[in-house]
From Swiss-Prot:
Pathway: One-carbon metabolism; tetrahydrofolate interconversion. Its EC number is 1.5.1.5, 3.5.4.9. This is Bifunctional protein FolD 2. Gene3D superfamilies: Leucine Dehydrogenase, chain A, domain 1, NAD(P)-binding Rossmann-like Domain. It comes from Myxococcus xanthus (strain DK1622). NADP(+) binds at residues 166-168, 191. The gene is folD2.
């Protein structure tokens, strides 16, 4: 393997340490403790694991945290009432609705009901629109984390060709916008794209589609930076990303492992977003 591994766990630990230091200062100087409320509907096993990870991180950095766990049969109207109560609670600075939601509940309606200033996922239409317009806003956690990883390895996107594989509202679209804001020339790939051709020209490649080893190592441009957001379980139980890791690592300059690459950064940047929401909500200037 020629590529250097990008250690997402180590970078995430640094982000959490930065957040904790700021939380300690807020408590000492202003009596302000950031509060994060997580809403998990039903018994989806993966959601339970993700929420537990978020609660653990929140405790580590010194937040107050609450998990609201309504039954899967809750009506959309009743869930909206839960959101409205959290919106009105001054102790809650960040609200996260864990996806997926049951089929009878429209996630767009629920996400849009969260106050934009308490939307720490960065999914509210107002925050998504502000990102599009280049305004200061809460950023979607996963692409925000990817940008921090690029910063950590000294990769300046300016003037580089960045290819984002996947166009979801959660990762692909905001990822492309964040790279564009840093003056990369950005291409978004989807099911109708000539994927190999686009990947072969990428200086920075971000793959987020949820398809095991879709991107072949032989396609990677020598010296490229490869960020693999995917996490897929193969029939033998092995976790792999969306990129053929071993072959890609022979050609890339930097590459994220799966697991241990992007995943830890998503939770770390959620902590960052929650702290920033608390600062804005409490009208206290951030010191960075």
């Amino acid at each position: 393997m020629n590529a250097q591994l990008i250690d997402g766990k180590a970078v995430a630990a640094r982000v959490r340490a930065e957040v904790k230091a700021e939380v300690d200062r807020l408590k000492l100087e202003h009596g302000l403790t950031p509060g994060l409320a997580v809403v998990r509907v039903g018994e989806d096993p993966a959601s339970k694991v993700y929420v537990n990870g978020k609660k653990k991180a929140a405790e580590e950095v010194g937040f107050r945290s609450w998990e609201l766990h309504p039954d899967e049969g809750i009506t959309q109207a009743a869930l909206l009432e839960v959101i409205h109560q959290l919106n009105a609670d001054p102790a809650v600075h960040g609200i996260l609705v864990q996806l997926p939601l049951p089929r009878h509940i429209d996630p767009d309606v629920i996400i849009s009901a969260v106050k934009p200033e308490k939307d720490v996922d960065g999914f509210h239409p107002l925050n998504a629109g502000n990102l599009l317009l280049g305004r200061s806003t809460t950023r979607a956690c996963t692409p925000y984390g990817v940008m921090r990883l690029l910063e950590e390895i000294g990769c300046d996107p300016a003037g580089k060709r960045a290819v984002v594989v996947g166009r979801s509202n959660i990762v692909g679209k905001p990822m492309a916008l964040m790279l564009l804001q840093k003056n990369a020339t950005v291409t978004i790939c989807h099911s109708k794209s000539d994927l190999r051709r686009e990947v072969e020209g990428a200086d920075i490649l971000v793959v987020a589609v949820g398809a095991a080893e879709l991107v072949k190592g032989a396609w990677i441009k020598p010296g490229a930076v490869v960020i693999d957001v995917g996490m897929n379980r193969k029939p033998d139980g092995k976790l792999v990303g969306d990129v053929e890791f071993a072959a890609a690592a022979e050609r890339a300059s930097f590459i994220t492992p799966v697991p241990g690459g992007v995943g830890p950064m998503t939770i770390a940047m959620l902590m960052r977003n929650t702290l920033d929401a608390a600062v804005r909500y409490g009208l206290v200037p951030v010191v960075r």
